[in-house]
Amino acid sequence: MEQYLSLLKEILEKGQKKEDRTNTGTISYFGTQRRYDLSKGFPLVTTKKVHLKSIIFELLWFIKGDTNIKYLVDNGVNIWNEWPYETFKKSKDFNGESLADFVLKIKSDTLFAKKYGELGPVYGKQWRNFNGTDQLFDAIETIKKNPDSRRIIVSAWAANEISKMALPPCHAFFQFYVNNNKLSLQLYQRSGDTFLGVPFNIASYSILLAMVAQITNYEVGEFIHTIGDTHIYLNHLEQVEEQLSRKPLKLPKLVLNKKIKNIDDFKYEDIEIIDYESHPAIKAKVAV
């Protein structure tokens, strides 16, 4: 994953200090792009251990059109917990519960989860019901019937619903492209937390690309990752330096269940990353 390491270096070399919504502070560089050829291996960062389970379940959650964290926490995925917890803390029902207490209540109390586990009309809702349009289904059908179309786009950015979202979409929209019997996907991401979030985004959309390629009978091409505000949080600088000191290892392989022919039929056990070797995990705090 030299491309990813070069992205970290580019931000450090060209970026400027910038304040942000979380009051953490960043080094930010505007407008970056990296290309990942999936025929050369699955683009999963090897210079630190990445939590694959979270990536896969989150992607399945998007595809389901779900916007409540209960599905995630029930499956041991905790990457979205902080946002609804912050909303809960401002409610009249908050009695000093810790984040861990909040998550336990989401798991055990369906009514509580329905009320306080909701993130609003975020990714999954927009992918599958953008003002009544199932964008993901339409994109797949267009790939099958009109692969040369320049309109094979799925957008998570619904301007009229941004205020209702716990967090406006960072990975805002993506486009499919067919050429030489290969399917490629380009993602535009308005904001990229390059240490914590971007490795997830690269892997997630690469899996999605492989899924759609399989069900539309194309080979996998490239994942092209374009990011607007590409940043490293100031409290991640030590972790970034540690990661840059490590040598990348051989890329793993993605294996999908070949029997799956419909995007909605994929389950966790149908998606496997094999031969993944990595350096140890590097912990860092998410900015909320």
Swiss-Prot record:
Residues binding dUMP, per UniProt: R21, R150, R151, R190, S191, G192, D193, N201, H231, I232, Y233
Keywords from the UniProt entry: Cytoplasm, Methyltransferase, Nucleotide biosynthesis, Transferase
Signal in keyword set: no
First-listed, main subcellular location of the protein, grouped into a coarse class: cytoplasm
Enzyme active site: C170 (nucleophile)
Top-rank lineage group of the source organism: Bacteria
Enzyme Commission (EC) number: 2.1.1.45
Record Pfam families: Thymidylat_synt
Known pathway: Pyrimidine metabolism; dTTP biosynthesis
GO cellular component, one term: cytosol
GO MF, one annotated term: thymidylate synthase activity
Classification via InterPro entries: Thymidate_synth/dCMP_Mease, Thymidate_synth/dCMP_Mease_dom, Thymidate_synth/dCMP_Mease_sf, Thymidylate_synthase
Binding annotation for (6R)-5,10-methylene-5,6,7,8-tetrahydrofolate: H51, D193, A287
Enzyme category, top tier: transferase
Subcellular location: Cytoplasm
Entry's Gene Ontology BP terms: dTMP biosynthetic process; dTTP biosynthetic process; methylation
Catalytic activity line of the entry: dUMP + (6R)-5,10-methylene-5,6,7,8-tetrahydrofolate = 7,8-dihydrofolate + dTMP
NCBIfam families documented for this protein: PRK01827.1-3, thym_sym
HAMAP family, per database record: Thymidy_synth_bact
Role description: Catalyzes the reductive methylation of 2'-deoxyuridine-5'-monophosphate (dUMP) to 2'-deoxythymidine-5'-monophosphate (dTMP) while utilizing 5,10-methylenetetrahydrofolate (mTHF) as the methyl donor and reductant in the reaction, yielding dihydrofolate (DHF) as a by-product. This enzymatic reaction provides an intracellular de novo source of dTMP, an essential precursor for DNA biosynthesis.
Complex formation: Homodimer.
Similarity remark: Belongs to the thymidylate synthase family. Bacterial-type ThyA subfamily.
Name of the molecule in the record: Thymidylate synthase
Native source species: Mycoplasma mobile (strain ATCC 43663 / 163K / NCTC 11711)
Name of encoding gene: thyA
